[in-house]
Amino acid sequence: MQPRLVIAGTHSGVGKTTVTLGLMAAFVEKGNIVQGFKCGPDYIDPSYHRAVTKRASRNLDSWMVSEDVVNDIFIEGCNGADLSIIEGVMGFYDGKASTSDKGSTADISLLLQAPVLLVVDISGMARSAAAVVKGFQQLNEKVKIAGVILNGAGSERHAEMCSEAIKEACGIPALGYLKKGDVPSIPERHLGLVPALERGEHDSLFSQLAAVVSRQFDLERIERLALEASALSRRTNLFQQTKRPSVVKIAVAYDAAFHFYYEENFTLLRQAGAELVYFSPLRGEDLPSHCDGLYLGGGFPEEFADELSQWIKDHPQLKKRVQSGLPTLAECGGYMFLGEQLTTTKGKTVEMAGVIPMVVQMENKLVSLGYRDVTPLDDSFLLSKGQQIRGHEFHYSKAVYTETERPAYFVKGLFGEGKEGYMSDHLLAGYTHLHFASEPAVATQWVKACEVYKNRRLHRGQVSQ
């Protein structure tokens, strides 16, 4: 059994995250082991999920990876959990195109045969709420909208009126409601959000959400709905292959400045024979001297520019190690970190690692957002020329090269295409967050490159510690 629910919304901003976190917190308080998932490529909401459930949340994205792999990511993630709660993205039917459900929350709910709770903002309406729900039921009659959550109620009586209308016209119950002002607003998705989550600064918010949801939601009926979901079977052997004994160590920067990683990337690397060794530049920790590879993920280096600049001064071996051939993948924030300088939106410029001949300028507006089809322009330790992988891009900065650029990828998105990133024989870096499950061979290729580096290092007498 894999008890599960999808929390969907009529539109962005309707309260999906509030309801999701409230349910997670309430079920955790009841003693349940709760697993979080997020539809789409977003990293921020999974950070919330992790803060509440104490389990790594996983992304379910039917554009970046195949439907079979989405199915298996879900099965892999919910292992050991009593209940899985899947937070939707945008409106229920919003996906890759305006005429298709592909990539939408509805798409994921059908793929996983999961019952759906639809969050509806009932502000300023009564019976009309039933018309809204009816439309969502009828647009694709294959989906299973099993109940609704009413948000923005003016009073308990207002929620009752809408509930009665929906039950009569749509045949499904309202299983909970939130009145205006019931709970504090979820903090904006600003740069300091994840560090604040890691410090536990929002724990009181989660407790308030749990209290309100426990009082105003029918948790027993919601749990019964989740238990009605039929068991899923694995469709691939992607996460079932015999794990190779660890043969190399890959250092992974992991702290408030570097924390945007897809969990499947870690899973596939371990399966291929890598031991992941985590270190935190923000805590002043050294790059592990015994590592055979380096993974610098995304995050918010601009938020910690001074601290990272000082770490680079105190740890010059990072530049030396990367330039000496350490197989290194740097994505988005990690890419920025390896540049020569970073200039904040306030005009302050700090020195960065100086590995890549570029300067990074932070902007006050979004520079790039969207899915990417990625094709490497040449052979590297991770990808062969022409080998394809998929990923996602989201950043507020621009990279300006100070020498001739050596772009890593040709990337194609919905609204354009072009070259991006930087590469050498042992370094692959760019703004795109790569999803290894879209091309699983990359994990094996990286581990093989690390083995070559390790053997060369040992031959030079640098014995592994």
UniProtKB/Swiss-Prot annotation:
Q: What is its EC number?
A: 6.3.5.11
What family name appears in the similarity comment? Belongs to the CobB/CbiA family.
Single Gene Ontology BP annotation: cobalamin biosynthetic process
InterPro entries xrefs: CbiA/CobB_synth, Class_I_gatase-like, CobQ/CobB/MinD/ParA_Nub-bd_dom, GATase_3, P-loop_NTPase
Read off the PROSITE patterns from this record.
Answer: GATASE_COBBQ (PS51274)
Function in brief = Catalyzes the ATP-dependent amidation of the two carboxylate groups at positions a and c of cobyrinate, using either L-glutamine or ammonia as the nitrogen source.
Q: Which cofactor does it need?
A: Mg(2+)
Q: Where is the GATase cobBQ-type domain?
A: 249-441
UniProt entry keywords in alphabetical sequence: ATP-binding, Cobalamin biosynthesis, Glutamine amidotransferase, Ligase, Magnesium, Nucleotide-binding
> Which pathway does the record list?
Cofactor biosynthesis; adenosylcobalamin biosynthesis; cob(II)yrinate a,c-diamide from sirohydrochlorin (anaerobic route): step 10/10
Q: What else is known?
A: The a and c carboxylates of cobyrinate are activated for nucleophilic attack via formation of a phosphorylated intermediate by ATP. CbiA catalyzes first the amidation of the c-carboxylate, and then that of the a-carboxylate.
List residue numbers at the site (Increases nucleophilicity of active site Cys): H433
* One GO molecular-function entry: ATP binding
Q: Where is the organism placed in the taxonomic lineage, from the top?
A: Bacteria, Bacillati, Bacillota, Bacilli, Bacillales
Active-site residues from the entry: C332 (nucleophile)
Quote the gene name from the UniProt entry.
Answer: cbiA
Q: In terms of domain of life, where is this protein from?
A: Bacteria
Q: Lipoprotein as a keyword?
A: no
Q: Which CDD domains match?
A: CobB_N (cd05388), GATase1_CobB (cd03130)
Q: What is this protein called?
A: Cobyrinate a,c-diamide synthase
The record's comment about this protein's domains reads: Comprises of two domains. The C-terminal domain contains the binding site for glutamine and catalyzes the hydrolysis of this substrate to glutamate and ammonia. The N-terminal domain is anticipated to bind ATP and cobyrinate and catalyzes the ultimate synthesis of the diamide product. The ammonia produced via the glutaminase domain is probably translocated to the adjacent domain via a molecular tunnel, where it reacts with an activated intermediate.
Query: Which organism is this protein's natural source?
Result: Halalkalibacterium halodurans (strain ATCC BAA-125 / DSM 18197 / FERM 7344 / JCM 9153 / C-125) (Bacillus halodurans)
The record ties this protein, via Pfam families, to: CbiA, GATase_3
Please list the reactions this protein catalyses: cob(II)yrinate + 2 L-glutamine + 2 ATP + 2 H2O = cob(II)yrinate a,c diamide + 2 L-glutamate + 2 ADP + 2 phosphate + 2 H(+)
